[in-house]
Structure formats: structure tokens, C-alpha cells
Amino acid sequence: MDKELIKKLVAQGKAYVLDLRGGRVPYKEGNAAAVDFYCPQDVVLNMPWVKMGRGHINLYLGIELPKGVGLDIRSRSGFTDKGMQVDVAFIGKNETQVGYMTNVRADIDICLGLVDEDYRDNVGALYRVNSDRYMPTKDSKFKLDSDYEYYVFVVKKGTRICQGAFRKVENPDCILGELNMENNRGGGYGHGGTK
């Protein structure tokens, strides 16, 4: 596509530019509110000395957003509801893989992240491993050749790992001064109740 046309479409807010750097074009079905991003390679999420923790998965792509648009990177609803779909790799005494279990659900969350309109480096998905437990699914396959020392969670290449939702971003100026307290509802965290 012509560079000037691309520039014009981005300036009008009708398109964004995607630079694949080893990643894959995000998937969008029909009028879905978000695009799905793929894991570009197998990624180990936890190590034996860190049962829980956080990190990021590099999606190996860059994005140029229109002015006034941000991109929220968030969890897919199925992962939030049922747990992230991963494989388990069982590691033996010699640090070699001695078994596996595929298609399990683990308590791993994709944390909310924001891509700013002026960010051009690689986009990633932030994650948090909440537990070292996992639940097999009806599609799980299991093989274990010998005793294992520990196991790790592996997100397989091609997994739709997170969603990206575009949103308008307002950037008002900050003015130092006293707040208008006429319509202050008061309270704070949890003050509104649950019923």
C-alpha cells in the first residue's frame, strides 16, 4: 500500500500500522470489540525456584496508533474464567524433559497493559503466575518417562494469548488548585456497598 495513503488513514483514525518482527497478524472476528494476539514462540512462564511470579511475553510486533488512540492489552475472557491454557513440561534430574501434559488450565493471568500512541518498540503481554497448580481438561494428553524433579508451564507457539482493545485517550491539562467539593459523594474503597 502507498505510504502516503497509509499515513492519511492513520491520521484519520481509520487504520493502525502493524510491523511484524517475528510475530503474527492479530486475529479479529466480525465486529469483535478486540483483536487476539498470538504467542510467537514457546514460552516458559515459571521456573522451579519461582512458583509464582510475573513477567512478560514478547509478541514480536510493533504498532503505530492513530493520534488520540491507546491500545489496552488484556486477558481473553476464557482465560480469566477458566485459567490460562498451557502445557506442563516435567523436568528430570539432568535438567531434561522427562514428560508432559498438554492442554491444562492454570491460574495465570494476563495483566492489563497500555500501548501509548507514541510507543514503537515491541509490544508484550504482562502475566502473573498465581499458583503452581493446574487442572487437566478433556483434551489433555499425558506422558511421563521417569521421575521428575519439577515442572514448568509452557505457552505454546500460536496460542491466542491476549486481547487488544483500542480506545480513545483524552489528555487534559493539569491545573493546581482547590477542588469543588459541592458534589463530593464521600466514602472510598468499598463504601458504596454490595447491594
Predicted stretch roles:
Residues 1-195:
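DUTPase catalytic domain/fold
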